Swiss-Prot record:
Composition bias, Low complexity: 1-28
Name of the gene encoding the protein in the UniProt record: ABCG3
Location in or out of the cell: Membrane
Domain ABC transporter: 114-356
Protein name: ABC transporter G family member 3
């Protein structure tokens, strides 16, 4: 208590300033809040040699004599010599590592101000747009500052963030106004960045490669300019030590940790040098050390002039001290907006002062999270050494109403409205698009990136090639030495059927890699870094070398081990036919994966489809003998196995002659009629190849429709929703 007493000039007891509900708080607890206007004392990290004792630079908005708004450097204070002041109620903040530390020079502001007034967001419920997720929210954010939207789960944090960024889903409707630099103009491409809670990274690329390809996809201009932007993003997010490290690692090296991956996701948006950066849960799944490092890095980014707005569930005391302003939400209602220290005073005035040894964010969530009521009910007979289990002895719903009413009648709410009026009374600089890379450039970048990823993904590509070789060797040894007699026709037909069917079925092993590509596309498309056509064309061109390598290696082994006709032109047709078969199969897998977006359901569906196509391919029963409904129409005609096998058999038997006895002979077409139905036309095999080519493009056209118009959202969304319901019921 001696240390607390020594800080009496900066702190006062909440019992002397709180409103009447303070009586509900046990007297055995001591609560202290900072006096308004007192300076923030940063913590020193004496045990960390990487952080120097630098002054804490606080960027805040002040009114000048001329009535304008300006960003001024606040008074800097020396670093506290110890961590003990954290326990005395001081909102501690670690020093921000900057290039010009200690010089007191404020960097040029390149951000943009954003303000929102009476912002309400509704979602489609039982009645159209009946569920209000965000209710009449007001707030603002300045360049060079960090504004955090805090609240419990399902409080409307992410919805408010998406509304500010203009990224609400079609099922949501927004009311109210959002101003950027004083005007209601839409933020163009490249003027802002948005980082999702969970982003998909490419594990087989290094950090520098990943950011460089992202810059090539996003930015126009010359290569050397993009390299400079990438290096700036790496420096800004403190990724220099990991720049040449694979994101996902490999057999002999671990990949990046969750905190480092999160910083890479943010760095990807920084290559556009946005004025405003929106981040959904930057501390998601991060431990305390990674969380603190993340926030210090973001603080450094804010000091460069960028406007940061992000959501957060809870934070430690050190992290909380880094925030400039806080928007506290509960059930869509704004319980407070203002500076972080003023939020502590607000809770104290409402009768819920923060205990000395408790993190402010934990205290806020305890007071406004209704889930704690169930825990208190379960533990109502439990008491700690000081008496009560909880410091807030009030029903959460009552606490929320008290905090909301206190805020609406406070000077903080009036100051927010006054600042919004001041920010919107005149229009500032309009944000302009910085341009984007052309479609041809994006296709070339995605193609080259796909080739690089395939060359490094041994688990999904090279292992798949090995499996194809093992399968082909197995089939080749099983059907070796057949000869060219009439008696070997049935066995040769079976060998071709087994080769095409089983090789296509084995291609399902590539589903995980395709799902990763779809997730990467969705992540890039959400920020307009890529498009459906560009993605499909780049993926198609990038997969051609790998699929052709598999087709030529497997075809050569099978062709010579089984002993098919010794003719180079026939061999080339065999290779091309099987290559087209793999292209169709890849398109089918991409189509199914795009529908489900789940490994289990995609694999199950593909296996079922392949089995049906194999049954209708004409080997187990000739196509003319198949039942007309279902099996002939449509299965026999939509099965790509049918056209591939038919073309390969026409390639093998048309023009061939078999001797029957010593004087009689029959054509290859006549010899195969009892085993498989083919056409006697010598050009029929090329028609079958054209059908395969059309199917390869047809499946990708269906994928384009799904990606472009989002027709798969309802199917996959319902599946995931039912899956979550089943898990919750368990």
């Amino acid at each position: 208590m001696e240390e607390i007493q020594s800080q009496s000039d900066l702190y006062r007891s909440s019992s002397s300033s709180a409103s009447s509900p303070t009586s509900r708080v046990p007297s055995s607890h001591f609560f202290y809040v900072r006096k308004p206007g007192s300076l923030r004392q940063p913590i020193s990290f004496e045990d960390s040699p990487e952080w120097e004792d630098t002054p804490d630079v606080d960027l805040r908005m002040e009114d000048e004599a001329g009535g304008g708004d300006s960003i001024n450097d606040a008074t800097t204070t020396p670093v506290s010599p110890s961590l003990s002041k954290m326990n005395s109620g001081s909102m501690a903040s670690p020093p921000v590592p900057e290039g010009g530390a200690g010089t007191g020079v404020v960097r040029k502001i390149a951000g943009a101000s954003i303000a929102w007034k009476d912002l309400t967001v509704t979602m489609k419920g039982k009645r159209k747009y009946s569920d209000k997720v965000v209710k009449s929210s007001n707030g603002y954010a300045f360049p060079g500052t960090m504004t955090v939207i805090m609240g419990p789960a399902k409080s409307g944090k992410s919805t408010l963030l998406r509304a500010l960024a203009g990224r609400l889903p079609p099922s949501a409707k927004m009311y109210g106004e959002v101003f950027v630099n004083g005007s209601k103009s839409h933020m163009p491409y490249g003027s802002y960045g948005f980082v999702e809670r969970e982003t998909q990274l490419i594990g087989s690329l290094t950090v520098r490669e990943f950011l460089y390809y992202s810059a090539l996809l996003q930015l126009p201009g010359f290569l050397f300019q993009k390299r400079s932007v990438v290096e700036d993003a790496i420096q800004a997010m403190s990724l220099s030590d990991y720049a040449n490290k694979l994101i996902g690692g490999h057999c002999y090296m671990k990949g990046l940790r969750s905190g480092e991956r999160r910083r890479v996701s943010i760095a990807r948006e920084l290559v556009m040098r946005p004025h405003i950066l929106f981040i959904d849960e930057p501390l998601y799944h991060l431990d305390s050390v990674s969380a603190l490092l993340m926030m210090v890095t973001l603080k450094k980014l804010a000091s460069m002039g960028c406007t940061l707005v992000f959501t957060i569930y809870q934070s430690s005391t050190e992290v909380f001290g880094l925030f400039d302003r806080i928007c506290l939400l509960s059930n869509g209602n704004t319980l407070f907006f203002g500076e972080t220290l003023a939020c502590l005073q607000h809770f104290s005035n409402a009768g819920f002062p923060c205990p000395i040894m408790q993190s402010p964010s934990d205290h806020f969530l305890r007071a406004i999270n209704t889930d704690f009521d169930r825990i208190i009910a379960m533990c109502k007979n439990w008491q700690d050494d000081n008496g009560d289990f909880s410091a807030v002895n009030m029903d959460t719903a009552v606490a929320i109403r008290t905090l909301e009413a206190t805020y609406k009648s406070s000077a903080d709410a009036d100051s927010v409205e006054a600042m919004i009026i001041k920010l919107t009374e005149r229009e500032g600089t309009q944000l302009k698009s910085k341009g984007k890379a052309g479609a041809a450039t994006r296709v070339a970048v995605l193609t080259w990136r796909s080739l690089l990823v395939m060359s490094r993904e041994w688990k999904y590509y090279w292992l798949r090639l090995i499996l194809y070789m093992i399968l082909t060797l197995s089939i080749g040894t099983l059907y070796s030495g057949l000869g060219h007699s009439l008696s070997s026709v049935a066995t040769r037909v079976a060998a071709v059927f087994v080769f095409v069917s089983f090789a296509s079925l084995l291609g399902i092993a590539g589903i995980p890699s395709l799902l990763k590509e779809i997730k990467i596309y969705r992540s890039e498309a959400s920020n307009q870094h890529s498009g459906a056509f560009v993605f499909l064309l780049g993926q198609f061109l990038g997969s051609i070398p790998f699929l052709f390598l598999m087709s030529i290696s497997s075809s050569l082994v099978f062709y010579f081990m089984v002993g098919l006709r010794d003719d180079f032109s026939l061999l080339m047709y065999f290779v091309l036919n099987f290559f087209m078969c793999l292209l169709v199969n890849e398109g089918l897998m991409l189509f199914i994966a795009c529908i489900w977006r789940d490994v289990y359901w995609s694999t199950l569906t593909l296996i079922s489809v392949h089995v049906i196509m194999m049954l209708a391919a004409g080997h187990f029963r000739i196509r003319t003998a198949l039942p007309k409904p279902v099996w002939t129409y449509p299965f026999a005609y939509i099965s790509f196995h049918t056209y591939s096998i038919e073309g390969l058999l026409e390639n093998e038997y048309l023009g061939e002659v078999f001797a029957v006895g010593e004087v009689r002979s029959i054509s290859g077409y006549q010899a195969i009629q009892g085993n498989y139905q083919i056409s006697p036309d010598t050009n029929a095999k090329w028609r079958n190849m054209l059908v395969l080519l059309a199917m390869a493009f047809g499946y990708r056209l269906l994928v384009y429709v799904l990606l472009r118009f989002g027709l798969n959202k309802n199917v996959s969304g319902r599946l995931l929703l039912s899956h979550k319901k089943n898990n919750s019921s368990r």
